[in-house]
Each structure stands twice: as C-alpha cells, then as structure tokens.
C-alpha cells in the first residue's frame, strides 16, 4: 500500500477554499481507492488571520488521518497588504527578503515542517496543494522523499519570486487543473518532473429541484447567480455596475452567495444569502438564468463547473485565461471584458431560451466528459504509484 502524506495549509469539512476543498476531495478519494493517506495541516480555519481554531493533534475524517499543528503567529492582514504592496512594486527598494515575505504570508507552523522532516521516511510520497504558502515552500525545502504538487497557479506577483523556482522544479510531478494553468507554469519554469493535466472532479447532482432554493430564500423573480468569496479582486464591481443597468430593463435579481469580505451595494434586486447548504447551492445553480464569474484571476473556478453541472450557462471575465478555456472548450457560456459587454452577453442569453438551454446542455456534457471523479482519480493514481515505486 502506498503511504501518502498530504500537505495543505487548512483542512476540514467546514474549511472554505478552492485548494483546500480540492485537497479534501482528493485525499478522501485516494484513501478510499486503496492508498494510505495522512494529512499534515495547521490548526487554522481562517485564511485571513491564520488564527488557531482546531485542536492540535490527530483526528480522522472519512477514513483520512488528519494531523494538525499550531500556527506560530497570527497574520495582520492590513500590515500584510501594506508590506506586499510595497514589496511587489518594481519601483520600490525591497525592505524584506522573499523568505521574509513567505513568513508574513504564512501560515507559519515550524512544528509541522519539523515533524514532516523527522518522519518523512514513514511515507512513500508527499502531495502538496497550492504553491503559495509557507507550508508548501518550507516543507518542500527539507523534503527528501518523492513529491508532487497541485500548484493551483495563476498569474500573480508571488509566482515570479526567485524562490518559486525550487517550489515548481523540485517535485517529481505537477498536476494541473486546466491547460491554461499548465501553459502558464511551463512558460515560467524549467520543469524537470512530469506535467499532468489531471483536472479535478465535480459531483454531478441530477434531478435537482430548482424551486428548493427559491422557497428557502424567498426568491420570486428570475435571477443571476454569483457564488464565491465576495471580496475586492474578484471583479464584482463590474458585475454590480452592469446589474444596475440590467435591472432598469428587466425584473431580475442578482443573488450573491458566499463569504462577504466587502460592502455590497444597496440596490434593488441585489440579494445576499450568505452560505447555503449543498442542496440549496445546487438548486440555485439549477434555477438561475445564468451564473457569473467576473474574477480576472482563477486557477480553476469550481463554481463555473458546478453551474455547467446543472445545465446553467456562465458569463465569464475574458481577462482570465482559465475561464476562457472553459468557455472555448465547452461552448457553455459567453465572455465579457467590461460592464457593457456583460450586459450584452446577459441579454443574448436572457432573450433566447433556446440558446440558453443549448449552452446549458453542452456545458453539462463538458463537465461529464472531463471532470468525473473516477477519471480524475485514475489520472492521478497512475503517476503517484509509478513515482513511489521508482523512488523507493
């Protein structure tokens, strides 16, 4: 039996985040398919402060052993943002080193790194989720065992730091969620390990009752849906501006679900529902006229795939290569570059039920073909076994 150590900054059923959810989905499915999986993570639940939330020690979730280690220091996001703004400004003199920036980024857990360094011979291979954090950068540095990395990378300042060369070039294989992500990383680094377009899996729920969400949240009018973190940097300002104009001509709502980290305009038709159950989320996607993903930087956008899985078309930011890849390969939505184009794309979908239904169906076919969990785990399992057998 192949013994796998998974390294990720946060982990748990109630932890919200793309890389974190990916790590849990893959860990549980690898464990269920015959691998022996142990997760090394921190006690943090909140990625803003890295505040210790869970108890240190060992627990088990759906058969996967979880070992949590305390975070040494909480993060002050205001200080971090100020320092980062200066650090990544090419016109400024660097007041800190790249290593010091990684420490500020966190979550710093020296006990986690030390434990893996001391106990790594108990494992055949390590899997790291996301390139960006202390837990990946520092642990890879001390690791002698085989490793693979899910970078979940997109174009952003930290990926251009010199120390990222070792992070991307040391692993024996890199697994990518999209072709755009793989191309980005290949263009930036001289990759020695294997590069594999693994994608990720989506739970395709059929026979979803689209009225369930409406009943629970009192939604009467047709609605557009945004699901994800509601924060600056996600392109929501363009969506809000466009919706004001859309609302003037159409009795339609804009429903927002997810964690609110920025102010939401007080405008007719904008409805914030917070976190919802998985059943309500599927129902919302099923019942929406369309979903909208306005973010300019995504490494996958699971919500786009969830929308397709409910046969609902998606409007996406054309500046994001990953989102454009989904649209080009599937035909399940339309792009926009600004608020005027968003309005135009929405009108194209809204005024033609036939076109909307067709986009929904071919979006579903795309997800079913490329993002079934059985196929994803097969694509991941084969190289993991081969690397483990070759290196040990």
Where are the regions that the model predicts?
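Donor nucleotide-sugar binding/catalytic pocket of nucleotide-sugar-dependent glycosyltransferases
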Residues: 146-157, 164-209, 219, 226
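Conserved donor-binding/catalytic core segment of Leloir-type glycosyltransferases
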Residues: 216-234, 240-244
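Nucleotide-activated donor-binding/catalytic signature segment of Leloir-type glycosyltransferases, i.e.
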Residues: 258-283, 287-290
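Short acidic/histidine- and often glycine-rich active-site loop of Leloir-type glycosyltransferases
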Residues: 265, 319-330, 335
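Aromatic "clamp/platform" in nucleotide-sugar-dependent glycosyltransferases that forms part
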Residues: 296
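Short hydrophobic beta-strand element within catalytic cores of glycosyltransferases
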Residues: 313-317
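A short, well-ordered alpha-helix in the C-terminal region of glycosyltransferases
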Residues: 326, 348, 355-369, 376-382
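Conserved acidic donor-binding segment of nucleotide-sugar-dependent glycosyltransferases
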Residues: 329-340, 348-353
